[in-house]
């Protein structure tokens, strides 16, 4: 294909436009006073055209960082204007709209990958053309601006002449059909490079058509002259004609410009130099331009380092500018010593063409903010970056500031990306030069205004969300800024550190704030159970075994204020009216002695570490151990074991602060033994012995003293300094322990009922009577607890005791009386009659069932009637709700089913089932005490083989998930604390997942591909690693060495790929997904009761989800208003950019998105919904072109956004009446103007 003629009209029009662009670079860099003076020197017609064109080119000039100030010499700008006039540009100037359609679109984008090869090949072509034209003579016109009559006007057919445009008539400005070179919409620029005329040797003849390397016998062709009737200059123009035209400028300017011979691009070999050749002079004189180029900032290299332009006389004025659509690059001359620009060294072969590399340092942190689904979870060592940020920047990239020393080849080597992103979002006007690598920054102009606005916004958010005090403190710490002089340090987020320390230690962060409380009414017990149950639902601990220890029980009542524990972060959550107080506060003295001189040292950190796990503290106080090796030999009979379970259930979460034993040597040894066996679980409490030989607890609980007189009347001596309780006059076990000597070491195996201690007038409660009747009916001849221990040992030697057989169903008689007896024995345990229990230890080997109840005992002190069902007496008329059998066999949690049934039912929660329960096993759910019913459902004893059906793992994630899914009734919610299932459920479920985008690493031998989409990963493997040309293929996937035929190899590869999936980590859920987006949707709709939006943590009271929080709709589509996972492409691979490379944004760049969003007093959910409307979807940063699939709803907004690097899309100014999006977000690019996409 023949090379295009550089003397053609299209080529010269292009060069004229580039000269005008060079003029605008100097004009844009001039200050305002210089621009005003230039306006006074230019005629009105030309000035109007220049200003209209400048308005279009100004965004591009701003994107090139051409700042005001470097050019103060008006003579330089005037000289450039004269050169434009001398070329005849204003005779038929192209429409200024063409710049916005072609020139800007090509200059601001990357070129094609083969440009460098074309540049080298084209340089050789120019050398050949220059050599061949040295011997050629061209007749040119003389300086009187009249065409030379000796010029041959006939078209020349020579291969070296302009055979196409030699006889063309002058262009008509009004007719675009006669001027195809000016119709930029239809013009396709040549995909070749043109050497600037300024770099042609001065002794060469006029520019001629390039000689194609394939053309032979060039010597046989004779070159004719090139006349001046080409381009847009008419052949009949005279000096008087030009001076009479207002648009061409004053006669003085024209005449002064025509007095400089010797600088024309067209010269002859004769001594006569045509003065009119200055009309086509493409380079300014050395005398006038040298000094101005040293101060020019039109090029980034010259702006950064002016010393590089020492040889500016030989520099290319169009250096660094090239077209993308035409692949035409204006390269510097062969003799130029100027450095190559970033366009020449940028490795465009490795950059994905649809991904924009134009990213300014001012918006680095903001791009990180918008490239993540939850920006607060990005790690400093591995942030989730925008794909555009994967372009590696070298050292000294920025103009100034502290960041440039930290760019060691990659942006991800920067110090703290979390702080950078948060600082950028809080201070939109903060320039990048004020940021420092450690996350600190220097004060800027609007620092105080933005600090005040952020504080005001934060307080409004706290009031709207009704956050707990700890959450408020955490938010204020995250948004705080410490100022030291001019340096500002954002306060560190200590939430993660506190969570890590709390999860690894047994601190007070997880203890319930409680107070020592005593009551004599059943109503008090009901309130106690209700408040304590709220805490039990939050805990998830391992199953525990019991060794009974005798101790006087002081009832620990949780505070009536709202409190709950976040089991994920192990942080105590409270409402605003609650003050945290641990169960075991510091003692009055640093060291106090236990009985017989057992020292106990108190340390705040140790106390916090011990009191975090309340279950373990209670276990240590009761002698409960988690392993069989640590458990001492059993010395209890069946009866006492059953009683021990009741005490465990009622006091497992309570701290036993005093005991009944006398200070005998045996009891002291027992206390020492407990501390020796499990020192980590024994609370460091402070005991003292008074004159009555009563061991009291001196631990300071730092809680207010109960105001009720009945509560304080139980204290025997009225000593308010110690939380001591004397032995009551009557005890349920007084018949079994007639004297104090009987309360020896074995007395630790006896539990004192909480109800019996707190019951007024020593009245035996129904629970106590049940236990006592069972006790007396089992063995009426028992005299002491030592005899009971011997009977327990015999029962253990003989195998499984009666109670264990009764529970496991191994020794159930076939007659009706045996079944009724077994059901009667099990009913108190399952239905919650004994007490509000968290765990029921069935046998030594049978696992623990975690369950919960929401009901209170009837507020009455009178005795309830009993049904005589053998030896066990159970209160009458207790109603039970039986869960459906189909629900039993399902895998969904119990709370989900109850939620579907209705919100007025009580809930069993925290039950982890690994296998399906038998359909014949109904489970009874207790209702409120006020809802009496005559129905009483029985429990089928045949289905009680819990060894096969119930998992031993109680600490599974499903327990925490199902714990707070209950939808409580209004009546049940009144005495309970407020549950926040949003934070409780969502954070637990989503903390299990990997954050960010998925990564799929190719396991093929020698392949290092790492993709972020399973679809792209499958394409990569099937296309790259499946050689279809071979008949037999060997599999090199990981350790697979199979050799298969080519037609079977694809199915074999797909078998490997099917194993790469994202599995749902929720227990009993076996679904797998190919990307995080589908997995999130699965969790939202299958395992969570509401939508997951990480930006808004709204209080959900009583399980009722607010509709506006659940569904946030989009103005253009029907999608939810959440941020989706849009990392759907592979990361582009890019080599390091040159040292002088600088990121250039597209026209209309503006980085103050958050500042605009927060200017109006919008609520938090509205801001998030507004972000969802602004193209933050899969077309983020130009991930695919406009021909990709559109949205499901059929709208084209997602695919038709103008993005940098996409061909064929131009931005045109339109009137405000045209309905266009008011704000477009293209990754880090924000365009505020009304635009129209074509």
Swiss-Prot record:
Residues 785-796 have a biased composition (Basic and acidic residues). The keyword Nucleus applies. A zinc finger (C2H2-type) spans 1062-1087. Keywords: Centromere, Chromatin regulator, Chromosome, Metal-binding, Nucleus, Telomere, Zinc, Zinc-finger. InterPro entries: Znf_C2H2_type. Interacts with clr3. Regulates silencing of the mat2 and mat3 loci. Organizes the chromatin structure of the mating-type region where it also participates in establishing the 'cold spot' for recombination. Required for proper positioning of nucleosomes at heterochromatic loci and for transcriptional gene silencing (TGS) function of the Snf2/Hdac-containing repressor complex (SHREC). This is Cryptic loci regulator protein 1. It comes from Schizosaccharomyces pombe (strain 972 / ATCC 24843) (Fission yeast). The gene is clr1.
